[in-house]
Amino acid sequence: MGLSCGNPTALASLEPGEVVLDLGAGGGLDCFIAGPKVGAEGRVIGVDMTPEMLAKARGNLGAYRERSGLDNVEFRLGEIEHLPVPDASIDVVISNCVINLSPDKRQVWREIARVLKPGGRVAVSDLALLKPLPRGVLDDLEALVGCIAGAETVDEVRANALDAGLTDLRMTAKPQYVEAMTSWEDPLYKKIAAALPDGDGMSDYVVSLDVAARRG
């Protein structure tokens, strides 16, 4: 249902009755995982900027409702830099390997802070850089679409979250995703690895990063 590099629904520790917003919902997988966790009194809103993915997600709603017995998930067309939800209306924002694709990541974090209720929290899984990639990789369109060339450094992610006014920031770098993609000889990862300096590997540059924080 879409690319993922972590498990933000588990990171978020969702509770019954909460309102959840998924940034870049794709085919809706994380929304459908979140739905039963928040239950009939909760609500899950998935936002995606592509009509094709929105149609796919909405097409999956019937199976979700039949399987779960719940009607608590909806999908909206919109950009994650300009979220189609009111201020202070969301308990939990989640996102799975999407923010790296945004051309204005600082604005995305501002939007996260805007839509969260006071005390609300964010749980994001994304790819991040331990150090800058070579220019040839950064200019590679396939590497951009593959969620690598657009990734920020861990320090840049931290700065964006804090600058947005979020607090209680916790970040955990996990090498397992990149190690798995490398061991599976993923074609994109092989291509990028070949462009790295001698002796360097993908895990020297890229990690899956879990980010959790709150709005004060």
What are these regions (language model features)?
Residues 128-148:
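Short, glycine-/aromatic-enriched active-site segment of Class I SAM-dependent methyltransferases
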Residues 66-81:
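Conserved SAM-binding strand-loop segment of SAM-dependent methyltransferases
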Residues 164-216:
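C-terminal lobe and adjacent flexible extensions of AdoMet/dcAdoMet transferase-like proteins
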Residues 106-121:
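A short glycine-rich, Lys/Arg-flanked "PGG" loop and its adjoining helix->strand segment in the class I
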Residues 1-19, 30-33, 37:
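Conserved alpha-helix/loop element of class I SAM-dependent methyltransferases that forms part
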Residues 150-165:
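Short alpha-helix
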Residues 57-58:
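Conserved SAM-binding loop
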Residues 16, 81-92:
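A short acidic, Gly/Pro-enriched loop at the edge of an enzyme's catalytic core
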